[in-house]
């Protein structure tokens, strides 16, 4: 068992050794290192072939046509290209966008930028379980609504939105639907032949591939058009210029192929470990799970331990690599905006920890985690005057705190 135990797979995943091995064959002089756009010699042809294979592997993962895959530097770029690209290309059709308050910062900040450019954005409230009711999306739709952007799996609480129904609704109204699948691609089945989604953002490093690479699925039938955000040599059919990073793309492709092959067995094992972890900590008094327990990705568990400060708990859990909130915002001491949107108060949001389990988590890891969590909570609550008051039956909401 390696300490600290890594339970932060929603932040990033280690590169699968099979992926790393494949990548190494596309870097050095004795490998396939050429520029895929070099059409005049063998080095370029070999690199182009490697990229074509990777494109097909990513397409196969979501049952798409290989021509619908645009390679990017990651999900953040894919999201920017999707949302800004649609908004700018179709601006004469309308300037209204619908999203939710619990989206990733990449979506929220892109929408904020468009607001500065004169677009109007509706940010939907989720239910207390993290799910967005379909009727709420429909009620927000207007004649000038151009785009709906809703994530498939939430990065903090792991809830799965009903993207099948959202896609049907958007298609029936002639509105473009973008889905952020950074947390679901390679972990949950996605079939674009069944799903009426127009754009899908995909990340490499969330599915045991390398960091710094991702993809955007852009539907061909009905055809979706985008305005490029990166100008240059006209790579990726003019949608994303820049020399293709062969080794990165080979890694992304291999990760996608492995994910497709191992998804069922991976998830069965991960679900067993997740259930074991939850069963090991749920007996702790004043412990709550955040987000819907049924409509949830099996590798994610967001738990609030009331009367324990999240940051002190993380320090106490030094043997566990976990986070409070997403990795992108965990450096700030603000409570998670996702948990606040679910209606949690500051104290409960601050006392939450995200545990995310993955391909390389073991039974032994979970046993150790349960032991460490239980001991740490007992120890921290022993030092907490609020816990003492709560145990004495004092209603803390009624206490008038004096300011000094």
UniProtKB/Swiss-Prot annotation:
Subunit details: Homodimer. Forms a heterotetramer with IscU, interacts with other sulfur acceptors.
Pfam family name, one: Aminotran_5
Binding site for [2Fe-2S] cluster: 328
Protein name stated in the entry: Cysteine desulfurase IscS
Catalytically driven reaction(s): (sulfur carrier)-H + L-cysteine = (sulfur carrier)-SH + L-alanine
Entry cofactors: pyridoxal 5'-phosphate
UniProt xrefs under Gene3D superfamilies: Aspartate Aminotransferase, domain 1 (3.90.1150.10), Type I PLP-dependent aspartate aminotransferase-like (Major domain) (3.40.640.10)
Location in the cell: Cytoplasm
Family: Belongs to the class-V pyridoxal-phosphate-dependent aminotransferase family. NifS/IscS subfamily.
UniProt-annotated binding residues for pyridoxal 5'-phosphate: 75-76, 155, 183, 203-205, 243
Entry keyword set: 2Fe-2S, Cytoplasm, Iron, Iron-sulfur, Metal-binding, Pyridoxal phosphate, Transferase
UniProt-recorded Gene Ontology molecular function terms: 2 iron, 2 sulfur cluster binding; cysteine desulfurase activity; metal ion binding; pyridoxal phosphate binding
Keyword Ribosomal protein (UniProt): no
Record function comment: Master enzyme that delivers sulfur to a number of partners involved in Fe-S cluster assembly, tRNA modification or cofactor biosynthesis. Catalyzes the removal of elemental sulfur atoms from cysteine to produce alanine. Functions as a sulfur delivery protein for Fe-S cluster synthesis onto IscU, an Fe-S scaffold assembly protein, as well as other S acceptor proteins.
Active site: 328 (cysteine persulfide intermediate)
Gene: iscS
Pathways per UniProt: Cofactor biosynthesis; iron-sulfur cluster biosynthesis
EC annotation from Swiss-Prot or TrEMBL: 2.8.1.7
Modified residues (N6-(pyridoxal phosphate)lysine): 206
Cellular component terms (Gene Ontology): L-cysteine desulfurase complex
Keyword flag Cytoplasm: yes
Group of enzyme by EC: transferase
GO biological process: [2Fe-2S] cluster assembly
Main location as per UniProt: cytoplasm
HAMAP family in the record: Cys_desulf_IscS
């Amino acid at each position: 068992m390696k300490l600290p135990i890594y339970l932060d797979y929603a932040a990033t995943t280690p590169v699968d050794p099979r992926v790393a091995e494949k990548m190494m064959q596309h870097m050095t002089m004795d490998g396939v290192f050429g520029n895929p756009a070099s059409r005049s010699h063998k080095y370029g042809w070999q690199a182009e072939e490697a990229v074509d294979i990777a494109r097909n592997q990513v397409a196969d993962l979501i049952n798409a046509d290989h021509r619908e895959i645009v390679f990017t530097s990651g999900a953040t770029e894919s999201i920017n290209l999707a949302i800004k690209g649609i908004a700018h290309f179709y601006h004469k059709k309308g300037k209204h966008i619908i999203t939710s308050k619990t989206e990733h910062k990449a979506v929220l900040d892109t929408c904020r930028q468009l607001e500065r450019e004169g677009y109007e954005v509706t940010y939907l409230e989720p239910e207390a379980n993290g799910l967005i009711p379909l009727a709420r999306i429909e009620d927000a739709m207007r004649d000038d609504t151009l785009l709906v952007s809703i994530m498939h799996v939430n990065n903090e609480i792991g809830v799965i939105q009903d993207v099948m129904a959202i896609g049907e609704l958007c298609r029936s109204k002639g509105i473009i639907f973008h889905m952020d699948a950074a947390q679901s691609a390679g972990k949950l089945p996605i079939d674009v032949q069944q799903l009426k989604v127009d754009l899908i953002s995909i990340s490499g490093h969330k599915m045991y591939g390398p960091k710094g690479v991702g993809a955007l699925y852009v539907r061909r039938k009905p055809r979706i058009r985008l305005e490029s955000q990166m100008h240059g040599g006209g790579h990726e059919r003019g949608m994303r210029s820049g020399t293709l990073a062969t080794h990165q793309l080979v890694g992304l492709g291999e990760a996608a192929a492995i994910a497709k092959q191992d998804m069922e067995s991976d998830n069965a094992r991960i679900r067993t470990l997740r259930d074991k972890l939850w069963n090991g900590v749920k007996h702790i008094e004043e412990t709550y799970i955040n987000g819907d327990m049924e409509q949830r990705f099996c590798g994610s568990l967001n738990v609030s331990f009331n009367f324990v400060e999240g940051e002190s708990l993380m320090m106490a859990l030094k043997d566990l690599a976990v986070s409070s909130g997403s990795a992108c915002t965990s450096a700030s001491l603000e409570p998670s905006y996702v948990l606040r949107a679910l209606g949690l108060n500051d104290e409960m949001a601050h006392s939450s920890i995200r545990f995310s389990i993955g391909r390389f988590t073991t039974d032994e890891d979970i046993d150790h985690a349960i032991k460490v969590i239980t001991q740490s909570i007992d120890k921290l609550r022993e030092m907490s005057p609020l816990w003492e008051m709560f145990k004495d039956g004092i209603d803390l909401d009624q206490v008038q705190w004096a300011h000094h």
